[in-house]
Curated annotation (Swiss-Prot):
Name of this chain's protein: Sporulation kinase C
Residues that bear Phosphohistidine: H224
This protein's record includes keyword Chaperone: no
Stretches assigned to the PAC domain: 148-200
Induction entry: Induced at the onset of sporulation, shuts off at T3. May be under the control of Spo0A.
Role this protein plays: Phosphorylates the sporulation-regulatory protein Spo0A a transcription factor that also controls biofilm formation. Requires FloT and FloA for localization to DRMs and for activity.
Lineage summary: Bacteria, Bacillati, Bacillota, Bacilli, Bacillales
SUPFAM superfamilies in UniProt: ATPase domain of HSP90 chaperone/DNA topoisomerase II/histidine kinase, Homodimeric domain of signal transducing histidine kinase, PYP-like sensor domain (PAS domain)
InterPro entries: HATPase_C_sf, His_kinase_dom, HisK_dim/P_dom, HisK_dim/P_sf, PAC, PAS, PAS-assoc_C, PAS-like_dom_sf
EC top class named in words: transferase
The EC number(s) this enzyme carries: 2.7.13.3
Length: 428
């Protein structure tokens, strides 16, 4: 009914006016009734009033629609601003000159500049103008590109520099003239620092790998060159030993040291020039039993008891080179035995996870302080007086080739635990 309100009211008022006029003209004025003129006059008046009222109704409806649309637009605008202000990314808009025309609240949070002080300023005033960035933007506009991305260093209000990744859209008019841009910017400082750190680590590893390769070649050459004359010296000393029986003790010391030098050279060659690995499937417990049987005599002579508990890995199969894996376990168990010169217990136990076997070797020795623990595994570093410092580096290399790892827990005065972690053979 509201859309006909003006017409209804106008017609009622017009009818009242006509009736009042007729009353004055015919009854009060005593004029004769002229029906044709009266009917035409009444009809023209009602139609005119109806048309005028129709225009008023339409205008009122149009005004109402405009107010409704204005209210809806205001609601949408407020909703859009709420959404934009809750975004973690900066949203910006610029005109053809590059002046900022819109910013969301994230701009203030990230850069420290208030939105009001930045409106109308040049967007590129807030990042470091590197040539590749400027060239990229100019090329995009010249090529009429619709969108793109670049990274740049931004400067906050307090002078802090951070990395920003910008994704933008470019807009043009009908004449292909640039009219402005709309985009988002994310703070990628942590990601950029991680990428730079990864690049630096890779470069450092590449340099170290090259150094190790050269060092390995050099070590292998030195080992061969030393071993050859050492063999000759040993042979001549054997002859001299028979000629000087009263100097037997001296010769025994010399031969003991030659044997030690030969052991160091052997381990150095093994570390520098590893042999080809033959991977086969083996029962883990069988390898451990063979190693402990081999070392039982050595342990007894050192007043050491070897306690074994392999139940957790019964039937567990691993892929690897049997001899190299035995070498790992022999080195680690011997370290445990040598860590207790006054005797004690070496405990060897196993456990397994869904994908790995864990072999633990625990001794009751003096343990190691943290500063020494950090050095363990470096070539020629040994905590033992007569150690070569090559046993653990060899173990680490072998385990790496078997996709395994070595974990060491030690505390001064409380002994050490060496854990060998090896992948189990897949059932597939």
């Amino acid at each position: 009914m509201r859309k006909y309100q003006a017409r209804i009211i106008s017609i009622i008022l017009a009818m009242i006016f006509i009736m009042f006029w007729d009353y004055l003209f015919y009854f009060i004025g005593k004029n004769p009734i002229n029906w044709p003129v009266d009917i035409v006059y009444t009809a023209v008046t009602l139609v005119s009033v109806w048309m005028l009222a129709y225009y008023i109704d339409e205008k009122q409806q149009l005004v109402k629609k405009m107010k409704d649309n204005e209210w809806k637009y205001k609601q949408l605008s407020e909703e859009k601003n709420r959404i934009m202000d809750n975004l973690q990314e900066i949203v910006f808009q610029t005109n053809a000159k590059g002046e900022i025309t819109y910013l969301n609240q994230a701009w203030a949070s990230i850069t420290g500049f208030s939105i009001s002080e930045c409106m109308g300023t040049m967007y590129n005033d807030y990042f470091i103008k590197e040539k590749h960035v400027a060239d990229h933007i100019n090329t995009q506009i010249q090529n009429k590109a619709s969108s793109g991305m670049f990274t740049a260093k931004y400067v906050t209000k307090n002078g802090t520099i951070f990395w920003g990744e910008v994704h933008y859209k470019l807009y043009y008019d009908r004449d292909d003239q640039f009219t402005g841009s709309l985009g988002t910017m994310s703070d990628i400082t942590e990601r950029k620092e991680a990428e730079d750190e990864l690049i630096e680590i890779n470069e450092r590893l590449a340099r170290e790998s090259q150094k190790l390769s050269i060092t390995s070649e050099l070590a292998a050459g030195i080992a061969h060159e030393v071993r050859n004359p050492l063999t000759s010296v040993s042979g001549f000393l054997q002859i001299m030993k028979t000629q000087y029986p009263d100097r037997k003790d001296y010769f025994d010391i010399i031969f003991s040291e030659i044997k030690r030098i030969d052991l160091v050279l052997s381990e150095l060659l093994l570390l520098a020039k590893p042999q080809a690995i033959t991977f086969k499937t083996h029962q883990l417990n069988e390898i451990l039993k063979q190693v402990t049987t081999l070392l039982d005599t050595n342990a007894i002579l050192s007043n050491i008891v070897i306690e074994k508990n392999f139940k957790e890995t019964d039937g567990c199969m691993i892929n690897g080179d049997e001899n190299q894996l035995k070498q790992v376990f022999i080195n680690i168990i011997k370290n445990g035995i040598e860590a207790m010169p006054k005797g004690g217990v070496v405990t060897i136990s196993t456990a397994k996870t869904a994908s790995h076997a864990v072999i633990s070797v625990k001794d009751e020795g003096n343990g190691m302080p943290q500063e020494k623990l950090k050095q363990i595994g470096k070539p020629f570093y040994s905590t033992k007086e007569k150690g070569t410092g090559l046993g653990l580096p060899i173990c680490l290399r072998i385990l790496k080739e078997h996709d395994g790892e070595l974990k060491i827990e030690s505390e001064a005065g409380k002994g050490s635990v060496f854990q060998v972690v090896l992948p189990l053979k897949s059932d597939s």
